[in-house]
Amino acid sequence: DEKYTNQYTVNKLFSDENPVDALKRELLTLSVEDYMQTVKDIRFPKRSEMREFGKVYNGTDDVYIKIRVELLGMYGNTTTFVMSFHFAEKAFTPEMFPYKKN
């Protein structure tokens, strides 16, 4: 379903913005309370683990965010890869967020 694609979600939420700028800004707003879980990459097991987050936009739109942070280059610079940023296929529930304060 197109609604659950990265492109559709970014275009819907940030229609008047450069998508790269919008995603960079949104990543900077993530907090430990948005954290859901850490997952291994089954397809690329030698890569670093991925972190899953969830945020609610416009009061009702659950958005699933998955990132991978890797050390690249000889100076150990970190690069963040956005693996997923799309409307959640299942509604978020409180137990999905281990560090969320009520």
Which role fits each region the language model picked out?
Residues D62-V63, R68-N102:
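Enriched for short, Lys/Arg-rich terminal
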